[in-house]
């Protein structure tokens, strides 16, 4: 990969397909350059870790409940000794509502995507069709050079 890159082809492919699977060198640094190019092109980026998200459709686009570990503690003054459920807003919708006025969209940059199942990759490949302002970039593994491929092709091949 060239030391200086404009990232134009990467941004064009991301806008065309909506979701890209990328392979990055293990020494790092390349993904930061492309994130900087995306921000310079007018996109807002959100960097999250793919493992542990749970049910992707509910986590990204619906209000969902989260229960913290109780660690043997009880809720004082409450007759039900269960653990409270906290309801969180949908991640994608919340960030879309709070985008700057001139932003072109939101890019979800997910690391460690190699742990996602084929169904989860298929869902992430169709999410940009449901939410046109959302683009997805998933790091699927390592390689000697920074390369990308549309996620639909990768989900079909996996």
Curated annotation (Swiss-Prot):
Described purpose of this protein according to its UniProt entry? NDH-1 shuttles electrons from an unknown electron donor, via FMN and iron-sulfur (Fe-S) centers, to quinones in the respiratory and/or the photosynthetic chain. The immediate electron acceptor for the enzyme in this species is believed to be plastoquinone. Couples the redox reaction to proton translocation, and thus conserves the redox energy in a proton gradient. Cyanobacterial NDH-1 also plays a role in inorganic carbon-concentration.
Regions that span the bilayer: none
- Name the family the entry cites: Belongs to the complex I NdhN subunit family.
Gene Ontology MF terms: oxidoreductase activity, acting on NAD(P)H, quinone or similar compound as acceptor; quinone binding
Which controlled-vocabulary keywords does the entry list?
Answer: Membrane, NAD, NADP, Plastoquinone, Quinone, Thylakoid, Translocase, Transport
Q: Which InterPro entries match?
A: NAD(P)H-quinone_OxRdtase_su_N (IPR020874)
Q: What is this protein called?
A: NAD(P)H-quinone oxidoreductase subunit N
Point out the gene that encodes the protein: ndhN
Q: Is Thylakoid a UniProt keyword of this protein?
A: yes
């Amino acid at each position: 990969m060239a030391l200086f890159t404009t990232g134009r082809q990467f941004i064009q492919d991301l806008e065309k397909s909506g979701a890209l699977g990328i392979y990055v060198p293990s020494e790092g640094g390349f993904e930061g350059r492309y994130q900087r190019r995306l921000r310079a092109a007018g996109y807002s980026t959100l960097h999250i870790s793919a493992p542990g998200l749970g049910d992707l459709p509910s986590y990204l686009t619906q209000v969902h409940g989260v229960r913290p570990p109780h660690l043997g503690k009880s809720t004082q003054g409450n007759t039900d000794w269960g653990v409270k459920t906290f309801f969180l807003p949908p991640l994608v919708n919340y960030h879309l509502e709070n985008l700057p006025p001139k932003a072109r969209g939101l890019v979800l940059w997910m690391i460690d995507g190699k742990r996602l199942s084929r169904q989860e990759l298929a869902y992430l490949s169709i999410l940009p069709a449901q939410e046109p302002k959302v683009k997805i970039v998933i790091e699927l593994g390592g390689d000697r050079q920074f390369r990308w491929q549309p996620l639909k092709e990768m989900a079909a091949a996996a």
